[in-house]
């Protein structure tokens, strides 16, 4: 992002950094990378920060681990049109089952990839079930709706049937993550879903709570200083570029000089360096 973009979305990111205990640079990377993958802009950074704050505070995970998960699955989620909220909800539910960070990321990526076609499930009690993943116009249904329909079907299966269907649908590596989503308790689903879909000012509220202790205040101060550095960096960049350009010009001139001239300059420089201490000693002697 350009500096103007970074500054336009810095407030929400700064609140998230303060709330999570992460530094501003790390939090900014998490937010900007995910927003880009979802096709969102800097103006959405405040809302995305709120979603992360709400999910991490209502599930067994944190902002850093969620950021790692988004790194793997956000490009696929964005391409399929899945929302940030639904993706964060699924990440939070996986976190409750101990599946976090890159493990959750690879699982989510595989799950989403395998939801591009109709989901076909079977069991002794439910028979053959087909769950549509697309709308009539060809667009993807919401991730939460697809998973909700899958949970209904899985609710009528034996444990062995659940494992077999999960492996068939998403593969061995991702089946543990998918089963975590299928076996999530209704109250946990309602808690995380309610939090991410009603998350306005969640990052700010968490940051305000953090300000009640020294660690939180220091984190906020550090974030504010980093924001100030970004602002000053933008203002000073023209001057710095001018200085660097001038130095490059001097170096070019020196490089273009004949070797004889370079040797003379080097000898003069060495003599000047040697004469300095001598002149100081002479000056002190004469002053006695």
Regions inferred by a protein language model and the residue ranges of each:
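Low-complexity, glycine/alanine/serine/threonine- and acidic/polar-rich repeat/linker tracts characteristic
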Residues: 1-5, 9-26, 30-47, 51-68, ...
